[in-house]
A protein has these predicted regions:
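Short, flexible loop/turn elements at secondary-structure junctions
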Residues: 35-37, 89
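Residue-level detector of short, conserved catalytic/binding motifs and their immediate flanks
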Residues: 29, 41, 83, 190
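Short beta-strand scaffold segments in enzyme catalytic cores
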Residues: 40-47
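Mg2+-dependent endonuclease catalytic cores in nucleic-acid-processing enzymes, primarily RNase H-like
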Residues: 47-181, 201-204, 208-217
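Short, acidic Gly/Pro/Ser/Thr-rich loop/turn segments
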Residues: 38-40, 202
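ATPase catalytic-site recognition across NTP-hydrolyzing enzymes
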Residues: 1-35
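Acidic, Mg2+-coordinating catalytic module of metal-dependent nucleases/exonucleases
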Residues: 182-205
Length: 217
């Protein structure tokens, strides 16, 4: 079947990228985080094997604080194997109280890295992992079937949070895309994945994200 019109990550296919990819106790765990309250708070739980990413679980909730999300994470079987991760650079903002990044450090005892990433650069990096390897025919990014928020944002299913859907580009009445900047909605899990991919692998083409100026929204 054809991908929905205007889908940002049109390379994603449930039949190619989804499977029974469960927690491997022999590997460390990384948390890739996009904080949110009114939309969604996304925590993508990643393990890396031979430069291939496996999203083994996610916490995808609406209306929870960072402290509450940490409590949810602490109940998971993979929690004791978490060694770090990445978060939206906006997680550094204080606004008169501890930043989101600091709360993860204080309450969860986890250090999450953050850096400025442009929207287009972030999408390009994600696509390099979704595209099948020209030699093996397999991509370098897989997700467990239970990661419904991430799968839905990429166009592979119904979003578990009512009112949220797929991450799309702006299109005109004919369905033609008219901007390389997608809508800043329905992208919480995808942005979390981008923060993690760039933190671990840099930008596509071997560039460093630290040289970019534009924040990812």
């Amino acid at each position: 079947p054809c991908a929905p019109t205007g889908l940002v990550l049109k390379e994603f296919r449930v039949t190619l990228h989804c499977g029974d990819y469960r927690f491997d106790p022999s590997l460390p765990v990384y948390l890739w985080v996009d904080p949110g309250y009114a939309g969604a708070y996304a925590v993508e739980v990643a393990q890396v094997k031979n430069d291939t990413i496996y999203i083994i679980d996610e916490v995808y909730e609406q209306g929870l604080t960072t402290e509450e999300v940490i409590l949810v994470c602490e109940t998971k079987e993979w929690w004791s194997k978490v060694i770090g991760g990445a978060i939206d650079i906006a997680g550094r903002q204080h606004q008169g109280m501890p930043s989101t990044e600091e709360i993860w450090k204080l309450k969860g005892r986890i250090i999450l890295n953050s850096q400025s990433i442009s929207v287009v650069d972030g999408i390009d990096r994600f696509r390099t992992f979704l595209k099948p390897d020209p030699i093996t025919g397999r991509p370098h990014f897989f997700t467990n079937y239970n990661c419904r928020g991430l799968i839905a944002e990429m166009g592979g299913g119904v979003n578990p949070i009512q009112g949220l859907g797929m991450w799309r580009y702006k299109t005109d009445r004919t369905g033609a895309i008219f901007s390389e900047m997608p809508d800043d909605k329905n992208n919480h899990a995808c942005k979390a994945a981008i923060y993690g991919l760039v933190d671990r692998f840099g930008l596509a083409g071997g560039r460093s994200a630290k040289a970019t100026i534009q924040k990812f929204y």
